[in-house]
């Protein structure tokens, strides 16, 4: 009976490793194991000119020439 319990504990230790994947560590190997993706990576979007400045979002012009840039995600 004791060898069966030891085998179960060993299999859990191998699956959980040091617990980093369970705790959400930012280690790349942990993210591969859990399937997590980092959503904080900067993404280069197509930028345009809005009111004479570079705008990487939505350019709104409610009153003709009074344009403003609203960045994506804000």
UniProtKB/Swiss-Prot annotation:
Signal peptide span: 1-19
Single Gene Ontology MF annotation: toxin activity
Keywords: Amidation, Cleavage on pair of basic residues, Disulfide bond, Secreted, Signal, Toxin
Cellular component terms (Gene Ontology): extracellular region
In-chain residues carrying the UniProt-annotated modification Tryptophan amide: 72
Source organism superkingdom: Eukaryota
Tissue-level expression: Expressed by the venom duct.
Chief location: secreted
Domains: entry comment: The cysteine framework is XV (C-C-CC-C-C-C-C).
Protein name per its UniProtKB record: Conotoxin Vi15a
Organism of this sequence: Conus virgo
